Structure formats: structure tokens, C-alpha cells
């Protein structure tokens, strides 16, 4: 089955109640595997720093239910060449990680507009359940 790649904006919605959280949970309920970059471990926890211990605990649980893919030299080299120029470095690493999945990538789940636009430019199927 094709993987669902979650970027950090989606993972945070699994840890903290936001308007899209329930729709995202429903969407993911029967979809496996769920993957992200190992980068998400730091990115998500930093996003939850000011949300309290229960949010951080929920963030750790959400991350534990994902297959976190290594950020290796090939991912970094690929990320370094991704366009558009305005693409932020961490987003480029997420996109490069997703791109490395090749045919095993089903959809990329993001709630970040710049990430969505860049992923579509790369030919990825993008979702944001709401």
C-alpha cells in the first residue's frame, strides 16, 4: 500500500486540537504506512514547546506511530537542489524525503501553503483533510 507522508504541520494537528484535527484523524484511521522525516522529531517538539507537557506527550505519541525516515546525504543533496528558490530548508528536506519514496509515496499531507505548492510542482498528490 502507498505511504502517506505527513509533514510537521500535519503531525502537530495530531498532538494539539485544531480545527482540522478530527478530519485528519478520520482520514488516517485506515491508511498505512504513515511516514515522515526524522527531522519531524525536532520540528514537531519545538512547535509544541509552549503548549504544555500534555501536548508534548501527545506529540511524542504521534511521532511514535510514524515510520521516521533518515535524513541522509542523498536526501540533503536532493533538498539542496529543489525549487522554488523561496522553499524553506526544512520544507525542502521534507519534500526530498517524500520524493525518495518514489512509487511508494501515495500522498503528502500538509497544511502549509508553501509546502503544498512546492509538492504539487514536484508532481506529488497533496491532501489536507478538513
From Swiss-Prot:
It is an enzyme of class 3 (hydrolase). The lineage of its organism: Bacteria, Bacillati, Actinomycetota, Actinomycetes, Mycobacteriales. The keyword Acyltransferase does not apply. Its cofactor is Mg(2+). GO terms for cellular component: plasma membrane. Toxic component of a type II toxin-antitoxin (TA) system. An RNase. Upon expression in M.smegmatis inhibits colony formation. Its toxic effect is neutralized by coexpression with cognate antitoxin VapB46. The keyword Magnesium applies. GO terms for molecular function: magnesium ion binding; RNA nuclease activity. Mg(2+) binds at residues 7, 91. Belongs to the PINc/VapC protein family. InterPro entries: PIN-like_dom_sf, PIN_dom, VapC_family. Pfam families: PIN. Keywords: Hydrolase, Magnesium, Metal-binding, Nuclease, Toxin-antitoxin system. This is Ribonuclease VapC46.
Amino acid at each position: 500500500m502507498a505511504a502517506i507522508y505527513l509533514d510537521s504541520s500535519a503531525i502537530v494537528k495530531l498532538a494539539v486540537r485544531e480545527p482540522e484535527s478530527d478530519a485528519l484523524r478520520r482520514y488516517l484511521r485506515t491508511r498505512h504506512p504513515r511516514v515522515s522525516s526524522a527531522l519531524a522529531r525536532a520540528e514537531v517538539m519545538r512547535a509544541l514547546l509552549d503548549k504544555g507537557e500534555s501536548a508534548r506527550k501527545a506529540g511524542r505519541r504521534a511521532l511514535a506511530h510514524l515510520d521516521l525516515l533518515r535524513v541522509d546525504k542523498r536526501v540533503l543533496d536532493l533538498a539542496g537542489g529543489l525549487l522554488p528558490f523561496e522553499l524553506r530548508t526544512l520544507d525542502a528536506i521534507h519534500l526530498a524525503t517524500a520524493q525518495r519514496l518514489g512509487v511508494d509515496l501515495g500522498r503528502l499531507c500538509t497544511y502549509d501553503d508553501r509546502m503544498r505548492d512546492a509538492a504539487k510542482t514536484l508532481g506529488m498528490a497533496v491532501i489536507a483533510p478538513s
